């Protein structure tokens, strides 16, 4: 049978394309095979839990059950190799000496994990490395001086009181548990928008969720789903998927929102508007700080830098603090004796809570211990990661080669029975001055440590203290046993299906 002219004409190009694709696939398969062999060789000295040949250890994290990690920690008290699929492995550590060794260096953050973050964070302090990170850190540090932070206390208190007014109305109309995380999330967004932009969002008074908050929450879910879905690790496959399309759309929403506010402020400054002298501005917001920051040579942030740093402040400050506040309330609800002791302390310092000052926050010693113990028990950011730029040798002599991604499990460190006695027990006295002085300096790392520790940790502690103090002055919180909580293994530990607590208005206030 003879081939037609058309069949003959197209046969050769199709054949060549087939051979090319086959060769490309073969090269990729060889590359992946060699990568797996290298990882197996590098991680062989370290014992690990049994792993599935294809899925690796994914089941430990896909079940949203942090208790499985605790079981591993009891068996492997320092570290273990962690596989996601057959070709990607991390080295997970949760020992204070191991943590100190890692964080005392200047290894860059994991590029593999960084690609899962929203694009608008790609140039901010949280993602930068090397000289540019150092320059940004130096320029931003004055913005977190206590003289700047003091002015935020009144802003925070105002937003918290708006939330408490909502709770009072709810409690007067129903005798059921309240989903508090939604309210705390909106309140935290309200605070961060005011501190970042001096922007009134009305997100607490609106019956519908703020579009910005909705975009942030949905992005977080997409990032988590992509991280633990092997197919979506490919940038091409992810971008062509419905989730990838949604990811890009949500990122554009956030970019446009931030850009609009920045451009409005720059136009005002160029027009000579002295915003600090207007009645609504009693403080210097974060955007002011970023726009006015200059180093010794007079260099300032570029437009992209301004956008990235403001976005980082918004995202890092909103989500993590909403989660932390919620978990503190949850722990105090489960431990009423500690809740009552905190309330008595706050009453003795604040009275009716009509005003709150920097010095008063410093007097809340027991409340601070309860906040720290919650951040140990349920760290809002459960892990951080680094790509080793050179070989790393731990104090016990074990060595990792350059190129390995090391994940410091803060959850694992804070629940390591070799580090903490009875780690699942809520015990604020762990953070008394005496006990803190005796503890390993790298045993408690809710804000990381070393040169890359969280630049906003003082801001965070102020918001946590102000919020918890005012809530305890006006409400007693008790758990809802019909709605147990789980700890989903996300980038940020947030209540998976909301947080329901019983709220009782206190008549004394």
From Swiss-Prot:
**Tissue specificity comment:** Expressed in brain, heart, kidney and skin and, at lower levels, in skeletal muscle and liver. In the brain, high levels are detected in amygdala and lower levels in globus pallidus and cerebellum. In the heart, very high levels in aorta, but very low levels in other heart regions. Also expressed in breast, prostate and colon.
How this chain sits in the membrane, per its record, is:
Single-pass membrane protein
Q: Which GO terms describe its cellular component?
A: endoplasmic reticulum membrane
Domain of life of the source = Eukaryota
Name a GO molecular-function annotation.
anandamide 14,15 epoxidase activity
Keywords for this entry? Endoplasmic reticulum, Heme, Iron, Lipid metabolism, Membrane, Metal-binding, Microsome, Monooxygenase, Oxidoreductase, Transmembrane, Transmembrane helix
Q: Which CDD domains does this chain map to?
A: CYP4B-like
**Chain sites annotated for binding heme:** 454
Which Enzyme Commission numbers does its entry carry? 1.14.14.-
Q: What does this protein do?
A: A cytochrome P450 monooxygenase that selectively catalyzes the epoxidation of the last double bond of the arachidonoyl moiety of anandamide, potentially modulating endocannabinoid signaling. Has no hydroxylase activity toward various fatty acids, steroids and prostaglandins. Mechanistically, uses molecular oxygen inserting one oxygen atom into a substrate, and reducing the second into a water molecule, with two electrons provided by NADPH via cytochrome P450 reductase (CPR; NADPH-ferrihemoprotein reductase).
Protein's recorded name: Cytochrome P450 4X1
Protein's organism = Homo sapiens
User: Species lineage, top-down?
Assistant: Eukaryota, Metazoa, Chordata, Craniata, Vertebrata
